[in-house]
Amino acid sequence: KIYAALEDSKVWNYVTICVFNPETFKAEKYATMSLEHQVKGAPWLCVDAENGYIYSTQRDNAPCLVAYDLETLEFVKTISISQPVHKIQGGEMYGSDLFVATNNDTQAVYRIDVLTGEAEKCFDRNLATGSEGEGLTALETADGAVLHVLDMGPLFVNANFRHYSYEVEA
C-alpha cells in the first residue's frame, strides 16, 4: 500500500490521508485529517506498522506528533514532542524511532521516540543558500549509510540524494 498526505494548496480545508494500490495506483481509501492538529496542511506522513499508526505534524514548529489509526485512518491521539521541530518535510521509522528531515535553518535531521516524544537533533545538513531540505528514507546499505535524504538546489533544477551513516543506540 502507498500512504500519502493530500492538501488543497495554501487553503488547507481538505487535508487528507489517502491509501493507494501500489499496482494500479488507484485510491482505495481516504479520510480527512484533523484540521485542529494539521495547521497549514500535512507536509508529510509516516507509517509505523509495528504500533499501528500513521504519524504526521503541522508544518511550523510542530509541538506534537499526530497519530492516526493505520487501518481506519481516524485520528487517535497526539504525542507531545520534547522540543518543537520546524518544517518537517518527511520521515520514516527506523527501529523503534522516527527520523525526520526538515527544511529549517540548517536542514537538520531529528530522531523522535514515538513512545515518549523525546526529540534530539542528529545532525545539520547546512545546504547551500536557497536549497530546500526534503524527505528522507531509512535503509541500511553496504557502505554503512542508513539515512538517505533528498534536497532541491536553489533554482529547483537540480536535486541531491545524500546518504548518511548514523548509529542508533540499542
What residue ranges belong to the model's regions?
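Short coil/turn segments that connect the beta-strands within blades of beta-propeller domains
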Residues: 1, 50-52, 95-97, 143-145
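Short loop/turn segments immediately following the C-termini of beta-strands
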Residues: 7-9, 57-61, 103-105, 141, ...
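Structural motif
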Residues: 10-19, 62-67, 106-112, 155-170
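Short loop/turn segments that connect beta-strands within beta-propeller blades
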Residues: 21-25, 69-73, 113-117
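A short beta-strand motif characteristic of beta-propeller blades
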Residues: 26-36, 74-81, 118-126
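Repeated scaffold domains used in trafficking and secretory/extracellular systems
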Residues: 36-48, 84-93, 129-140
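Loop/turn-rich, solvent-exposed surfaces of beta-rich toroidal or solenoidal domains
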Residues: 83-114
